[in-house]
Amino acid sequence: MKLPKPWWAGGGLLQLTILLSLVGLRVDLDLFLPPPAAALWEELLPLCPTRPASASNPFSASEGWERTPLLPAKGRLLHEVRALGVPFIPRTRVDAWLVHSVATGNADGAHGLLGTAASSAVGDGGQSASAGGGDPRAAHSSPLAAEEEEEKAAEPTAQVPDAGGCGSQENGMLREKSEAVDHSSQQEENEEGVSAQAKSRQQSKTEEHKMACASAREAEKITEARNESHLHWSDTSFSLEDLFQLLSSQPEHSLEGISVEDIPPFLSSVCESVNSSAQNINLSQAISHDVNLHEAMLLYPNNTFRRDPSARSSQAQEPFLQLNPHTNPEQATPAMSLPPFDNQMRNLTSQDLLYDLDSNIFDGINLMSLATGFSPLEVSQLFEEPDSGLSLNSSYNSTSLTNSYRIYDGTVGYNSDLQSLCHDLGAVGGCYPEPHKHCHMDHRTIAGFHVSLECQQVFHDHTYHLQSGASEPTSESFAWSEKSQKTSGCLDNPDRNLSRDEQRAKALHIPFSVDEIVRMPVDSFNSMLSRYYLTDLQVSLIRDIRRRGKNKVAAQNCRKRKLDIILNLEDDICNLQAKKEALKNEQTQCSKAIDIMRQKLHGLHQDVFNRLRDDQGRPVNPSQYALQYSHDGTVLIVPKELISSGHKKEAPKGKRERRN
């Protein structure tokens, strides 16, 4: 089992001081107090079931609180938290919450249980503080201790010896209640269908319960011994309910002078009481370490021991000032994680005080009302520090969001040509200006930008002093805002986008649109003019609009026909060029084929003349003779002289016939 750390180790006292400062209670922490004595550390170590041999006092004899390396950073965090100022929390709301925090049926039992637990815890704490060498001036320097001594002076002191019996009764009741809580949590897990995990958790719970019972018995023996030996702190014992009532009855700034030196006896006793009596409570299912103020104010009894991890991660991303920046408690550093005392204290108080609360009470208690209900004037009155140039406008109306968005639209690349775009829109026959490239933002991006601005405006009152890099709005941003306002006004005004004919028709209250006047057939147009009682000016304007519209349509049709003819002519030219190329290719192929035929014919002539012989058996000379083909298919060998003379005689005859 893991060795439980004392509540003051690891900066637990400093974290408690920071938590009280966030609530509004100012506590002066002296970081140069002497460290706890070794005797007190030796008395606290037997509370652990298994004490390792290496366990020792975390504070050396020569070094004090100032020697701890983690305290300077947390000291700076405490000063930053105090610099935020005291938040305004209505006291009437807190008092009503405390009055109605316990149901009527279980009020006596719950208050009695808390009273006995606090009384026994205070008694134990006083004895441990005296045994450990605590500061004796803590009992007299605190105004709370003085008031408690005055109240306890009138009460009998015979109740002190019964502190051990009350502690044993408290341990029994806490065991029964923790067993009931564990049983209910096991039933919920069985309903969810995780049977394997439920069995493993049940086994671990039984082992922890056995170990917790053994440690509780040892704690009871220690508390009985301390009650018998040390009784001087019993006069200052008081219950948690009395403490809460006392804190609520004090003025707003009356508790700022209380130092931490007055608190250690009571807090140490409460720590020991909780460690001794609530060991069997399953701390793995308790409130996780990443606790913020929003979750603490909106804590319901149903989800005290269980929290949805998705909801926890979503809430951790909200711009609240959280105590722990890590969303996963396993990955949190030991320096920033809250000690086990803080978890057990919240577990005990939430289990006893918030278990029987009606859920309707928590519906009216919402931390968001502190941000949404304030006006800028009230916020400026509550916080005395300047706002460092940032706007405290926390309203949710669209005007503020639009104005805040206009300040930043110059940084995303908007062009001032949108203003000229509105004025350059022509009438029916007008032309549109040259298109420009404008920056376009998606609607989802703009919506997300609005949401982020809205969150910063609402929740920045506690964190605006940390934003040192945020510069004040310059004159350039205001110039961009003016340009964007003109552009948005130009786009939002419907009269600017109308044509000249539409504006004239609207001015004369003509009951027809320009499109109907232009596109309507002639018969319908004439019947329309006869049905309505129109003035001469309206009729002339309607006819002018129709004439200009028809001329515009005719011109558009003419341009369309010209474009069609040009496009068709271009297509025809392309087709003719393709056909010409095809014919050229075909001619080339034909000339190649003719050349091949001539070569073959010449080879055939050579072959024939090589085979021919005259009457004397000599070969025929192809240069003197030629082959002549007749119509019947016969082939004759004729001298070339006769063929050439016959061609010459036929040529003059042909010329004569042409002349005749």
From Swiss-Prot:
Task: List, as start-end ranges, the regions of compositional bias called Gly residues.
Answer: 123-135
As annotated in Swiss-Prot or TrEMBL, what is the tissue specificity of this protein?
Answer: High level expression in brain, thymus, testis and placenta. Medium level expression in uterus, stomach and lung. Low level expression in kidney. No expression in heart, liver, spleen and ovary.
SMART domains named in the record: BRLZ (SM00338)
Q: Subcellular location, in the record's words?
A: Nucleus
Name all bZIP domain ranges: 541-604
What domain of life does the UniProt record list for this protein's source?
A: Eukaryota
A GO biological process held by the record: negative regulation of transcription by RNA polymerase II
Q: Where is the composition biased (Basic and acidic residues)?
A: 173-186, 204-214
- Identify a single GO molecular function assigned to this protein: RNA polymerase II cis-regulatory region sequence-specific DNA binding
Asked if the record carries the keyword Nucleus, the reply is yes
Q: What keywords is this UniProt entry annotated with?
A: Activator, DNA-binding, Nucleus, Transcription, Transcription regulation
Q: What's this protein's family per the entry?
A: Belongs to the bZIP family. CNC subfamily.
Q: What does this protein do?
A: Activates erythroid-specific, globin gene expression.
* Protein name in the entry: Nuclear factor erythroid 2-related factor 3
Organism of this sequence: Mus musculus
